[in-house]
């Protein structure tokens, strides 16, 4: 993908190959393609895909076609972009929270420093102060990114193909969910596997975090979400299913029932608790740890009876304070999935 220079020196009668038609791509362009392959290609969330499709308005183009002119279009208003997402993917979470999260991915403010650098440190979109749009908010392609698309045909074709394939994958996910009569729980599908990076983005966070900071769970107060990640291996001092609907769960070390995450979880208990709290539970079988993905088993409806207790520390020589509570899911786990997880 890097260069057509490899074809030099093959002789003047050398017949052009696919590789010969590739223009060089820069390190930044290559990093952007890496980001697109990791985040956009799987099609887990339509928001970024629809926003880019609206702003890029690519035409079908192949390397062996006659080169076509491409230029960035005019800014598009926030409400128009939201309408496009809601129209094409009515089952999706069309909230402002999810839209803002998608924008933060596309302007690169979402990523940690290392990931931002890994993906080229190059925003794809930016806000534009445009009159005539709702609240004056509109979005356009970042000028440098648009210039890359306009001047490097190979980069443009590869990026457009990734975008189209991501959109096709996304449509397949939503079509399959509809066929199975599955309803999205926020942006998650029951029994589907997600990586920790997927979960942070699909929770609508505007800033990702590192796996080390997330640990077994992390509260994001801006979105009122607290995903919980369990690597399942039942033992005396490990998180353990008590039934298909309840799990014995240990907090991070040093936490008490008065720690921020428990104060948040216990605040506003009542019939409307689920409207202000979203606690999705993800479980990974130890045998599948190399894959790095967790099954979504549903969201927590209650933290029952949180109590301060102790468990052995990492050395096994001492103990640490933790809070033990019973997580009660909104609905029981399917028996087949339950057996798979606990076996």
Predicted stretch roles:
Residues 18, 32-40, 47, 54-55, ...:
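Generic hydrophobic, helix-prone segments enriched in Leu/Val/Ile
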Residues 288-343:
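Compact mixed alphabeta submodule
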Residues 33, 121-122, 138-140, 156, ...:
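Short amphipathic alpha-helical surface micro-motifs
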Residues 52, 85, 228-230, 281, ...:
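Generic structural hydrophobic/aromatic packing signal, biased to beta-strands
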Residues 35-40, 46, 59-91, 95, ...:
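Acidic, glycine-rich low-complexity segments with interspersed aromatic residues
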Residues 105-222:
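Charge-dense, extended regions
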Residues 1, 26-30, 42-49, 63, ...:
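Short, structured coil/loop segments at alpha-helix boundaries
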Residues 2-132, 139:
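C-terminal accessory/connector segments of nucleic-acid motor ATPases
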């Amino acid at each position: 993908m890097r260069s057509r220079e490899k074809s030099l020196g093959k002789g003047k009668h050398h017949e052009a190959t696919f590789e010969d038609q590739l223009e060089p791509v820069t390190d930044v362009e290559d990093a952007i393609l890496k980001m697109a392959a990791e985040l956009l290609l799987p099609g887990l969330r339509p928001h970024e895909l629809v926003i880019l499709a609206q702003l890029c308005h690519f035409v079908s183009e192949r390397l062996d076609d006659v080169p076509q002119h491409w230029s960035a279009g005019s800014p598009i208003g926030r409400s128009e972009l939201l309408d496009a997402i809601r129209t094409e993917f009515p089952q999706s979470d069309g909230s402002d929270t999810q839209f803002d999260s998608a924008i933060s991915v596309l302007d690169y403010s979402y990523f940690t420093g290392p990931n931002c650098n890994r993906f080229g440190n190059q925003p794809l979109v930016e806000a534009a102060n445009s009159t005539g749009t709702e609240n004056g908010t509109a979005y356009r392609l970042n000028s440098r990114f648009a210039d890359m698309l306009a001047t490097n045909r190979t980069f443009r074709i590869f990026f457009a193909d990734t975008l189209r394939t991501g959109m096709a994958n996304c449509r397949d996910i939503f079509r399959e969910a509809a066929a199975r009569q599955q309803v999205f729980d926020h942006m998650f599908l029951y029994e589907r596997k997600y990586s920790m990076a997927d979960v942070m983005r699909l929770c609508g966070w505007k800033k990702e975090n590192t796996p080390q900071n997330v640990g077994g769970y992390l509260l994001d107060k801006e979105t009122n979400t607290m995903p919980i990640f369990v690597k399942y291996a039942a033992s005396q001092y490990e998180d353990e299913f008590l039934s298909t609907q309840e799990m014995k769960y240990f907090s991070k070390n040093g936490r008490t029932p008065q720690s921020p995450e428990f104060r948040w979880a216990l605040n506003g208990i009542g019939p409307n608790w689920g409207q202000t709290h979203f606690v999705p539970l993800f479980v990974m079988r130890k045998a599948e740890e190399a894959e790095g993905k967790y099954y979504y088993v549903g969201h927590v409806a209650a933290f029952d009876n949180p109590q301060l207790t102790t468990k052995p520390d990492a050395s096994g020589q001492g103990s640490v304070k933790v809070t033990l509570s019973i997580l009660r899911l909104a609905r029981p786990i399917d028996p087949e999935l339950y057996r798979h997880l606990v076996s």
